[in-house]
């Protein structure tokens, strides 16, 4: 009886130790494989035109996580369609052993993104801190980032915001036709500071969001050639949502964009606009349309407006781009900015 009791006590003590020791050995083995596999991962990324490098890396997180701690990490996209360099002094990527396809990111010292080659006058994006998540869902790669206090320096046109959320979806395989997605991107910008604001608006823009899906294969090559080939293959840009809150102005829309024979955008959207009077005043103040035309447009739009639950008038309308002109419903509101592909 005593011997049996001692065996039970010994088993109760030894079993957790054996399990803990086995888990420790498994964690150390997995950590070693992760560290040793990093160069192979970087080599695999080069086949996708991505150069990944770092000055130092450490595997930590025992016992309940795997955590990769990088110093001076750089990701350089060598694809001429998207060429850009992203640099970060520190990056921590952590995952739970039971969720190996979900990694949480932390960039406590921020990041800097520039077009590849550092062309003078090109846009430079910087932020003092960012967090995010990378996950594999149904074989698709998904990235979510929260970028804190980003600043965009683009020549003499600086932009800043309090917070920007970024979503990126990369399908597991490239599209074989125009009905399959090549890329999904979404932005949600809070408290955007513009360099110039037409009256009656003022800084900041409370919220601006955009979600798009690029449909059809994006061929390699210089931007003009790639855009022409994408257009000729039936490529479109599905605008899943557009939303804006800026003072009394509120706007929501969704639709489809394509490129015309001159590689300029054409498209049609449906949505709603509140505060359209302020919008017309701003268009007139910025010189897009004359004051008389803005007043006539405001009067015409008021016939279609309905009072919402908040007591404000709102119109359900369409927005279209055709022959280089923009239309809000049947009313032409001005020229579409020209895209220079060279």
Descriptions of predicted regions:
Residues 74-83, 111-124, 149-161, 191-203, ...:
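Flexible, membrane-facing loop/turn or short amphipathic-helix motifs
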Residues 66, 103, 141-143, 183, ...:
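Hydrophobic residues embedded in beta-strands of well-ordered beta-sheets
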Residues 2-39:
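N-terminal type II signal-anchor transmembrane helix
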Residues 2-14, 55-56, 226-232, 236, ...:
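Extended terminal
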Residues 38-50:
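Membrane-interface amphipathic/juxtamembrane segments adjacent to transmembrane helices
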Residues 47-176, 242:
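N-terminal beta-strand/beta-hairpin edge segment
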Residues 156-247:
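Acidic, serine/threonine- and glycine-rich low-complexity intrinsically disordered segments
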């Amino acid at each position: 009886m005593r011997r049996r009791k001692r065996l039970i006590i010994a088993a109760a003590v030894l079993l957790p130790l054996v399990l803990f020791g086995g888990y420790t050995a498994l964690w150390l083995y997995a950590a070693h494989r992760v560290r040793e596999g990093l160069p192979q991962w970087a080599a695999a990324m080069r086949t996708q035109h991505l150069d990944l490098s770092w000055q130092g890396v450490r595997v930590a997180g025992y016992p309940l996580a795997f955590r990769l701690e990088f110093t001076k990490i750089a990701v350089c996209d060598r694809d001429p369609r998207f060429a850009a360099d992203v640099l970060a002094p520190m990056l921590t990527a952590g995952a739970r052993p039971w969720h190996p396809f979900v990694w949480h990111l932390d960039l406590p010292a921020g990041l800097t993104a520039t077009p590849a080659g550092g062309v003078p006058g090109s846009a430079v994006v910087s932020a003092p801190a960012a967090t995010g998540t990378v996950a594999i869902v149904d074989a698709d790669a998904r990235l979510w980032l929260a970028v804190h206090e980003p600043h965009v320096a683009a020549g003499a046109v600086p932009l800043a915001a309090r917070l920007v959320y970024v979503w990126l979806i990369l399908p597991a395989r490239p599209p074989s036709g125009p009905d399959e997605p090549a890329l999904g991107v979404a932005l949600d910008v809070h408290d955007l500071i513009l360099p110039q604001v037409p009256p009656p608006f003022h800084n900041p823009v409370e919220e601006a969001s955009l979600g798009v899906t690029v449909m059809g294969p994006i061929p390699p090559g210089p931007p003009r050639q790639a855009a022409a080939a994408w257009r000729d293959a039936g490529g479109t840009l599905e605008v899943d949502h557009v939303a804006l809150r800026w003072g009394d102005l509120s706007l929501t829309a969704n639709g489809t964009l394509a490129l015309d024979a001159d590689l300029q955008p054409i498209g049609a959207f449906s949505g709603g606009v509140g505060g359209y009077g302020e919008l017309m005043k701003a268009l007139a103040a910025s010189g897009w349309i004359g004051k008389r035309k803005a007043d006539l447009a405001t009067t015409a739009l008021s016939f279609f407006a309905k009072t919402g639950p908040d007591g404000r008038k709102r119109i359900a309308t369409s927005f279209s781009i055709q022959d280089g002109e923009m239309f809000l419903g049947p009313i032409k509101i001005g020229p579409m900015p020209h895209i220079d592909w060279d």
